[in-house]
Amino acid sequence: MGCSISGLNALYDAATGGGDVWINERRFRVVRQIGEGGFAFVYLVRELQPQSDAALNRRASHDSEDGTYAIKKVLIQSKEQLDLVKEEIRVSSLFSHPNLLPLLDHAVIAVKGDWSHEAYLLFPVYMGGTLFDNANAMLSRKEFYPTADVLQIFRQLCEGLKHMHSYDPPYAHNDVKPGNVLITRHRGQAPIATLMDFGSARPARKEIRSRSEALQLQEWAAEHCSAPYRAPELWDCPSHADIDERTDIWSLGCTLYAIMYNVSPFEYALGESGGSLQLAIVNGQLKWPAGPNPPYPEELRQFVIWMLQPQPAMRPHIDDILLHVDKLITKY
């Protein structure tokens, strides 16, 4: 799916009082805002009756049965921001997997005012919130997922990531964290996990052959990879290094820890006198908080440690992780 740029195909028409959004031939009514961050706003919308055969033809297999969706609106102020949005659209179109959030439609339009363009990205809506939302709620209630749910959520996340790592060339998500994992719950079933936000995704393998290249990578990571989940080699990159998809494996280990304990594994350092998040991560200084009673199996803790190796070469690949998680699921 290419990036269409049209002044007519996407419009947030506040003047009419209807609060409607057009994306190509499809029209949506804004229900309410459900999120925001930076220059992006996320709205819950409901699709109005399709008006044309073209609109019907654009409908995808992921389209909502009840007509509700999420629309992400991005305000674009520079060519760099425009390029980033176009890249997010391009990368999102590469992947199709049940555990990766699909981009259903999009439009980028030129506008007048304080910014140059607006982008509208259409997604399925997941009202169960993110793992981060769930973790905060569970932390306040001192609740924990049972071991079986931990493993099922984590396995689904691994399946989505494997799809990206198996692409040719392999892609890294670069921002795996609880806030980018949507959760869907059905009564009597384990939660379903869906990985989202491909704005930081890039080809995973990169050769670093100078101090300048190492610093460029660190600067890029500081902007695009959330600090508590960022791999050590993205904090302090050697002048000669081969970066690969195992940066995601570190983030995956941090996320498994957060699924278990409702907190990230290294942010404890921020609450210590003289503590440093970077040093805790680079040195792999892991601490275990109080958990459920009875506690999680020691094998699950060792699974986390396996992924949180400061040296990338010591970390497993995604196929190894899936083999191991299946063994744990069989056991627990």
Feature locations, PLM:
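Juxta-kinase regulatory segment immediately upstream of eukaryotic protein kinase catalytic domains
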Residues: 1-23, 31
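Conserved short submotifs of the Hanks-type protein kinase catalytic core
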Residues: 114-130
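Protein kinase glycine-rich loop
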Residues: 31-38, 42
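Activation segment/activation loop of eukaryotic-type protein kinase catalytic domains
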Residues: 179-226
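Short beta-strand micro-motifs within the conserved protein kinase catalytic domain, predominantly
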Residues: 102-117
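Catalytic-loop of the protein kinase fold
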Residues: 165-185
